[in-house]
Design a protein with these regions (language model features):
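Active-site-adjacent helical/loop segments in soluble small-molecule enzymes
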Residues: 100
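Bacterial Sec-type N-terminal signal peptides, specifically the leucine/valine-rich hydrophobic h-region
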Residues: 4-7
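Short acidic/histidine-rich motifs immediately flanking catalytic phosphotransfer sites
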Residues: 68-70
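Exported/periplasmic ABC-transporter solute-binding proteins
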Residues: 10-39, 44, 58, 62-66, ...
Length: 247
């Protein structure tokens, strides 16, 4: 019996493939896209599991700076990506998508046909924007208002949000009369309407960047996922949700 047990112990048994979980912090505007990308990537890469959190790109940058356990980032801001690179906290940054800024209002509001952006803002009593210090969409909105010489006039009306999805929810709920969000966010909601598309000349280019966190011990797996965001499969999903192709 002992001999049989010994022989059995010596037999080769197939070892189950080891899986590695990587944690990615992504801009809030990417959540629905990531919900589609995640199962597609994990099916193609069965040894890699993905874990995500979502928020404003500035807050994600601050979490990386404070040493949070993050392997990679997907940011809606070149400024935040460049800041991490300059501090040697991130590497291998790559642009993977673009977007547009729009002004939205609740769907049940009168159409206000013919009103330009300045008139729409003047008509609103509360305007939701992401906090410009931590939310790229809010920074783009502030740049727009400043370039139109409207920021000082409209500043008292601004309701600051922690990320672009909170801006969307404020307008949906009627807690703000108007709000600046990305085109992709507006497309997701049946409760809002796009009142104006913002001229791209009024703000910095809107582009999304991936980057590896330098102190991650899972760089190979992280690189595999970040590279996947530039593949045709991931780009088709981004396009489905209204994102523009990377330049």
């Amino acid at each position: 019996c002992g001999l049989l047990l010994l022989l059995g112990a010596c037999e080769d048994t197939p070892e189950k493939a080891k899986t590695t979980t990587i944690h990615i912090s992504a801009a809030a505007s990417l959540k629905d896209t990531i919900d589609d990308v995640k199962p597609l990537f994990e099916k193609a890469n069965p040894t890699i599991k993905l874990s995500f959190d979502f928020g404003g790109s500035g807050l994600i940058r601050e979490r990386v700076e404070s040493g949070a356990p993050i392997d990679g980032v997907l940011l809606a801001s070149k400024k935040d990506a460049d800041t991490l690179i300059k501090q040697n906290l991130a590497e291998k940054t790559k642009e993977f998508a673009g977007n547009e800024l729009v002004l939205i209002e609740p769907k049940n509001v009168d159409q206000k046909a013919g009103m330009n952006l300045e008139q729409l803002l003047n008509d609103a009593s509360k305007i939701a924007i992401g906090d410009p210090e931590s939310v790229p969409a809010g920074a783009y909105a502030k740049q727009t208002l400043e370039n139109l010489n409207l920021y000082n006039a409209e500043k008292a009306k601004l309701v600051l949000a922690t990320d672009v999805r909170q801006v969307l929810s404020y307008v949906e709920a009627g807690n703000a009369d108007a709000g600046f969000v990305y085109q992709t966010d507006a497309l997701l909601s049946k409760k809002v309407q796009v009142k104006a598309k913002i001229d791209e000349k009024l703000h910095d280019p809107i582009a999304y960047y991936s980057a590896q966190v330098s102190d991650s011990d899972k760089k190979e797996e992280t690189a595999t996922f970040l590279d996947f965001m530039n593949t045709s499969e991931a780009q088709k999903i981004l396009e489905k949700y209204g994102f523009k192709a990377a330049n």
